[in-house]
Amino acid sequence: MPVRKQDTQRALHLLEEYRSKLSQTEDRQLRSSIERVINIFQSNLFQALIDIQEFYEVTLLDNPKCIDRSKPSEPIQPVNTWEISSLPSSTVTSETLPSSLSPSVEKYRYQDEDTPPQEHISPQITNEVIGPELVHVSEKNLSEIENVHGFVSHSHISPIKPTEAVLPSPPTVPVIPVLPVPAENTVILPTIPQANPPPVLVNTDSLETPTYVNGTDADYEYEEITLERGNSGLGFSIAGGTDNPHIGDDSSIFITKIITGGAAAQDGRLRVNDCILRVNEVDVRDVTHSKAVEALKEAGSIVRLYVKRRKPVSEKIMEIKLIKGPKGLGFSIAGGVGNQHIPGDNSIYVTKIIEGGAAHKDGKLQIGDKLLAVNNVCLEEVTHEEAVTALKNTSDFVYLKVAKPTSMYMNDGYAPPDITNSSSQPVDNHVSPSSFLGQTPASPARYSPVSKAVLGDDEITREPRKVVLHRGSTGLGFNIVGGEDGEGIFISFILAGGPADLSGELRKGDRIISVNSVDLRAASHEQAAAALKNAGQAVTIVAQYRPEEYSRFEAKIHDLREQMMNSSISSGSGSLRTSQKRSLYVRALFDYDKTKDSGLPSQGLNFKFGDILHVINASDDEWWQARQVTPDGESDEVGVIPSKRRVEKKERARLKTVKFNSKTRDKGEIPDDMGSKGLKHVTSNASDSESSYRGQEEYVLSYEPVNQQEVNYTRPVIILGPMKDRINDDLISEFPDKFGSCVPHTTRPKRDYEVDGRDYHFVTSREQMEKDIQEHKFIEAGQYNNHLYGTSVQSVREVAEKGKHCILDVSGNAIKRLQIAQLYPISIFIKPKSMENIMEMNKRLTEEQARKTFERAMKLEQEFTEHFTAIVQGDTLEDIYNQVKQIIEEQSGSYIWVPAKEKL
């Protein structure tokens, strides 16, 4: 039966009629599928195919209508007949094709230094193109993010290499001659002449119904964006791919960051969370992350992006009343004029809800909400500082006008967008009584039936209560004090993550009445400790909350410790005196929490690894007096810290001790039971029991003496630990004017398109390079394919003297070599919290791979801890990245602290 255009039009009409009747929610998927078919019917491609079919059946097969039978037939006659037909006869060439579909005359391929070029098109891409997927996501972690133009260390990019593309020969069969588009099956023939024909959605006739994670195709819009590559690249970062999905199992390629001043930002159309479908003519749906990056690298100077994004969401306006509490309003904000939280949007957004604060208790305000007004003060088109001031200048009763996203986001299972403007420092502000800088809110107690932060003292029962704990690897997880003159046994400390903390039933200030029916009301400290030690795995404790008695007891302990400290300092019996050392500055090589040290004789001083301390009184063997040194100068606060001798003695005792609860701590962490001999009768750890044995003394990290030194160069940066490559890439892409990489040396012969001094320093003499390595002129070197490769001290120095941080992808051994060369690097170790933490940041890792990564990190820490400038930890890569940026900024001054030659 011949195909007629009017039949197609009738079918289209019937489909549209049927679609209009599908108004129920359950019909949404069917309606979406019908819309796809309608779009196909209405496309230029489909109409062209109908025209061809009709022309073939009606005109070519019915020769009498257009051919004189008296003339001999010619093989080319059908083509001639088609050319004089009444159909549109505009020639389809690269000039008349829409710009969006015209292929480039030249193709460019990326040639890696030592690996063969990969294929342009992913093996997954066939004629049957799978529909793209897109979910609305927040920028939750940088772990899967690859920057389009960020390259570090030895990953040098060779210049693009043009190769001529061969165009197909004209067709010799009776079909419409069209210029094929690579990786697509597209035929373009307008049914009516158009001066500027619109771009046609490629392969609309073969698109399958996509498996949308959130929403249908009706929820999305499509756009073609043409960018001209600038000096700093395309100016955006991507994440995702089949090998490392950005969100869940969605393998789409997402835009995760728009770099201010880059090509994408100047164009203004590309947005964070856009999904890239094609780069020029390369389909990047359902491809690996590296394939997408390769497509962007090879795209040339003019890059056409076909993107898909979720349609703008409507907002619901509501008013929220909050009553200020001890923690203020209890939320953080970001955004404002000049400090956009989301590119192109000056609004003020809620970025964090602080546990136990007013907003948390009220429950209505959520992350991602937009603040429109506070009381009568409008917060639209205001600066960040103005918004903070308005929120701080409120009374106890605060009325917030907020715009909430509709349920389109609420049903996603992912948080609304929380995107940090890449061009500025993070400036989240907590709206609390005295906080202008962002602080990380305490994580909720996951296993506690009621969050302890929400309950006030008045809400906790004062009656005796029974608590059952199961002893874990950290014992019972609390410390006790008391037991003198029948004053009672009190809980003085709850170990985070221990059985007591996870139960949520015990708290500091509880008096222990009994343990497994053993009455402790009049027990001594030793009797209470023995009862807890011998209680077995399941321990039943009767406790009573007595905060007033505990406060009086604490005051008494404080007075005793003050007397001891004054007596100790006045006796001056220590081996290290301030009279012997005029000024003593040290760098801490461990974290110290004064609340975990029950032996402090006076007010303690908290510090963390890498902090600089000015020891102003080192005359005592056990305790020093010190103040912290910050980038802004010395702190006024003076506190007590454990001496080097005390730290090492306690740590060695811990390493030589067999503990009944197999208690373990991280290397360099101060034991919780650090106490003074004079107070032994009033404090102990409820889960410690020591049986010492003799063993070889271990090297213990405590303090490193340092001197301040002026530098006239920009310090190199070495990042070690899991996900370091992602962090390095992001630093270079976000701050191309502040970070760079040095040119390595190699004995490999130069290739035709390479430039000496740009791609590599090509060394003609292997013997000379080996000699330079022996003379320590290289911070790191190795051999690959019988060629030497290495990074020289001079190459690093050249980058440093240009005012850029040289990003180095090297081992920990390079830190010491740079220090010897008087190039003191900023060395940062990313310490994973656990195997699960690693797998969360890189979802494609197997459990075995995560275990090996974790073990490598622990070995790295053990081997190079004393050489690290700082150690960072975080739940997400975004947290870690922000910490790294802050550390680099703090360490970038003209005066730095370097290891001193003298020893403690």
Swiss-Prot record:
Gene Ontology cellular-component terms listed: adherens junction; apical plasma membrane; basement membrane; basolateral plasma membrane; bicellular tight junction; cell junction; cell projection membrane; cell-cell junction
Modified residues (Phosphoserine): S122, S138, S158, S232, S568, S573, S575, S579, S598, S619, S684, S687, S834
InterPro entries (alphabetical): DLG1-4_PDZ_assoc, DLG1-like, DLG1_PEST_dom, GK/Ca_channel_bsu, Guanylate_kin-like_dom, Guanylate_kinase_CS, L27_1, L27_dom
Domain L27: 4-64
Topology class, membrane: Peripheral membrane protein
Tagged with keyword Nucleus: no
Bias (Polar residues): 682-693
Molecular function GO terms recorded: cadherin binding; cytoskeletal protein binding; guanylate kinase activity; ionotropic glutamate receptor binding; kinase binding; L27 domain binding; molecular adaptor activity; phosphatase binding
Compartment annotation: Cell membrane; Basolateral cell membrane; Endoplasmic reticulum membrane; Postsynaptic density
Region Interaction with SH3 domains: start-end pairs: 162-212
Domain Guanylate kinase-like, first and last residues per copy: 714-889
Start and end residues of each stretch annotated as Disordered: 662-693
Modified residue annotations for Phosphothreonine: T115
Domain PDZ span(s) in chain numbering: 224-310, 319-405, 466-546
GO annotation, biological process: actin filament organization; actin filament polymerization; amyloid precursor protein metabolic process; astral microtubule organization; bicellular tight junction assembly; branching involved in ureteric bud morphogenesis; cell-cell adhesion; chemical synaptic transmission
Keywords: Cell junction, Cell membrane, Cytoplasm, Endoplasmic reticulum, Host-virus interaction, Membrane, Phosphoprotein, Repeat, SH3 domain, Synapse, Ubl conjugation
Family: Belongs to the MAGUK family.
Subunit structure comment from the entry: Homotetramer. Interacts (via guanylate kinase-like domain) with DLGAP1, DLGAP2, DLGAP3, DLGAP4 and MAP1A. Interacts (via guanylate kinase-like domain) with KIF13B. May interact with HTR2A. Interacts (via PDZ domains) with GRIA1. Interacts (via PDZ domains) with GRIN2A. Interacts (via PDZ domains) with KCND2 and KCND3. Interacts (via PDZ domains) with KCNA1, KCNA2, KCNA3 and KCNA4. Interacts (via PDZ domains) with ADGRA3. Interacts with KCNF1. Interacts with CAMK2. Interacts with cytoskeleton-associated protein EPB41. Interacts with cytoskeleton-associated protein EZR. (Microbial infection) Interacts with HTLV-1 protein Tax.
Record's protein name: Disks large homolog 1
Gene: DLG1
